[in-house]
């Protein structure tokens, strides 16, 4: 697997004062489920933003991405439409440039990203919080098999990426092996910069 991250050009200094909450974790960890529940919990909080990622594949039912063809994606890069973009698992992903305006306005921006972009984003943004969402390997395998998304590719290969790898650069780790409602409440507390333990 090849993953490459590229930041938008022309930004000077770390962007703030808002927070960039990066959600990372292995396939099948339940990131999209927890993000959907957290977004619903924050629906009336105008200081929390959940931008849609741009992806060069069709979105699944659990995702709210903007699907683009590879050619459209390249044009977006050429036009400077993305704050950051990266390639992973044979697809291209990006975050819209507008997240910078939200962060400058003091909002918390919550995004699902590849862990390969963490270092670059920590340099580009003043207040980055990395939340690793993970689950035991047997739970990951069950979820991936049940999901059976064509773009998941080789499930065994995806599972070989260590669960610990997702947590290596994390500020907070959520072991998503129980109630999605409970774990989404943990995520909301992190997003709102509150204590996340019950």
From Swiss-Prot:
One Gene Ontology term, aspect cellular component: cytosol
EC number: 2.7.4.23
Stored Pfam families: Guanylate_kin
Keywords: ATP-binding, Nucleotide-binding, Transferase
Reactions it catalyzes: alpha-D-ribose 1,5-bisphosphate + ATP = 5-phospho-alpha-D-ribose 1-diphosphate + ADP
SMART domains: GuKc (SM00072)
Residues reported in the UniProt entry to bind ATP: 25-32
Superkingdom of origin: Bacteria
Gene Ontology molecular function terms on file: ATP binding; ribose 1,5-bisphosphate phosphokinase activity
Pathway: Metabolic intermediate biosynthesis; 5-phospho-alpha-D-ribose 1-diphosphate biosynthesis; 5-phospho-alpha-D-ribose 1-diphosphate from D-ribose 5-phosphate (route II): step 3/3
Job description of the protein: Catalyzes the phosphorylation of ribose 1,5-bisphosphate to 5-phospho-D-ribosyl alpha-1-diphosphate (PRPP).
Similarity-based family: Belongs to the ribose 1,5-bisphosphokinase family.
Protein name: Ribose 1,5-bisphosphate phosphokinase PhnN
Organism name: Bradyrhizobium diazoefficiens (strain JCM 10833 / BCRC 13528 / IAM 13628 / NBRC 14792 / USDA 110)
């Amino acid at each position: 697997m090849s993953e490459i991250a590229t930041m938008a050009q022309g930004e000077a200094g770390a962007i703030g004062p808002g927070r960039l909450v990066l959600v990372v974790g292995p396939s099948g960890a339940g990131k999209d489920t927890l993000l959907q529940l957290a977004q619903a919990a924050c629906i009336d909080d105008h200081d929390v933003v959940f931008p849609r990622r741009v992806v060069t594949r069709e979105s699944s039912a659990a995702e709210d991405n903007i699907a683009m063809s590879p050619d459209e994606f390249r044009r977006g890069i050429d036009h400077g439409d993305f704050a950051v973009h990266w390639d992973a698992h044979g697809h291209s992903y990006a975050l819209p440039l507008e997240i910078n305006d939200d962060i400058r306005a003091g909002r918390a921006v919550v995004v699902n990203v590849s862990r390969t972009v963490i270092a670059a984003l920590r340099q580009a943004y003043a207040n980055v919080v990395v939340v690793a969402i993970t689950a035991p390997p047997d739970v990951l395998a069950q979820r991936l098999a049940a999901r059976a998304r064509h773009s998941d590719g080789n499930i065994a290969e995806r599972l070989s990426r260590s669960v610990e790898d997702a947590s290596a650069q994390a500020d907070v780790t959520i072991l998503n092996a129980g109630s999605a409602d409970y774990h989404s409440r943990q995520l909301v507390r992190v997003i709102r910069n509150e204590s996340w333990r019950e």
